[in-house]
Amino acid sequence: MKQLIIGLIKLYQYSIGLLIPPSCRFYPTCSNYMREALTKHGLIKGLWLGTRRILRCHPWNPGGYDPIP
């Protein structure tokens, strides 16, 4: 299941992600953060961390460097 989600993220990055201008306020980008969190922490915790990060990525958040814990 984890590999399926990582594959879907890669599909997004190499298809839709190339068609829209970059808008992520963080480094690494939210999609890279989710991939790394899933790889490092597994399915449940990785999804939790990635979802929290995506919810923080909005115009009222200053963004910046946000490494995976």
Swiss-Prot record:
Subcellular location, record wording: Cell inner membrane
SMART domains: Haemolytic (SM01234)
Any Pfam family matching the protein: YidD
Superkingdom of the organism of origin: Bacteria
Keywords per UniProt: Cell inner membrane, Cell membrane, Membrane
GO CC annotation: plasma membrane
Keyword Cell membrane appears in the UniProt entry: yes
Membrane topology: Peripheral membrane protein
UniProt cross-references to PANTHER family, sorted A to Z: MEMBRANE PROTEIN INSERTION EFFICIENCY FACTOR-RELATED (PTHR33383:SF1)
Membership in a protein family: Belongs to the UPF0161 family.
Job description of the protein: Could be involved in insertion of integral membrane proteins into the membrane.
Record protein name field: Putative membrane protein insertion efficiency factor
Native species: Nitrosomonas eutropha (strain DSM 101675 / C91 / Nm57)
Lineage of the organism: Bacteria, Pseudomonadati, Pseudomonadota, Betaproteobacteria, Nitrosomonadales
